[in-house]
Amino acid sequence: MDYDCCFTKEKNWFRYRAAAIIIEDDCMLLVGNSNEDYLYSVGGGVHMNESSQDAVKREVFEETGVHYEIDRLAVVHENFFNENNGFLKNLECHEISFYYLMKPKGNQELFSNSYTRGGTKEEMYWIPISDLDKYKAFPTFLKSYLSEPKQEVTHIVTDERI
């Protein structure tokens, strides 16, 4: 069994995550489920002894049913947040994520059969980049980053603790 690089200590939770920025026809692929009131990026925890590159390719395939190739590392994101419900309820969360820009396939065809760790079916949504600000979507930097993408790796720190 593989293990995510994640741990909880007292009221603190930490995770090392790899995530994908998948864009097709000026739309970004985001994920949602019936237990959450927001959308989130494709991706998940990096396993022990797994590179972030291998993790993002694995997660993308697990969630979309499609093999995407990495274009480049786009963003290193340090995120501080907390949740009012779910398995992270009452925890101070710290997540470090590597966001990879994936090479476009030229179509939006997916073969998704993805579920959350709690067993809830995940749905995939192609959201026009120009409409991202109309959605509650995480990470919150997506709209501004995608409006002016950079060629170099960007380091972003967000603190969304309530």
Model-derived segments and their meaning:
Residues 12-14, 88-96, 116-121:
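A generic structural micro-feature
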Residues 1-19, 25, 90, 157:
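Acidic, metal-coordinating catalytic segment for phosphate/diphosphate chemistry
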Residues 34-38, 113-162:
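Nudix hydrolase/Nudix homology domain
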Residues 81-111, 145:
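Active-site-adjacent beta-strand/loop module that shapes the phosphate/pyrophosphate-binding cleft
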Residues 24-66:
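Conserved Nudix-box catalytic region and its N-terminal flanking loop in Nudix hydrolases
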Residues 67-76:
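A short coil-to-beta-strand element that immediately follows conserved catalytic motifs
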Residues 22, 101-103, 126-128:
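Short, well-ordered beta-strand micro-motif
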Residues 26-28, 36-37, 47, 76-82, ...:
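Short, charged/polar surface micro-motifs in flexible loops or helix N-caps
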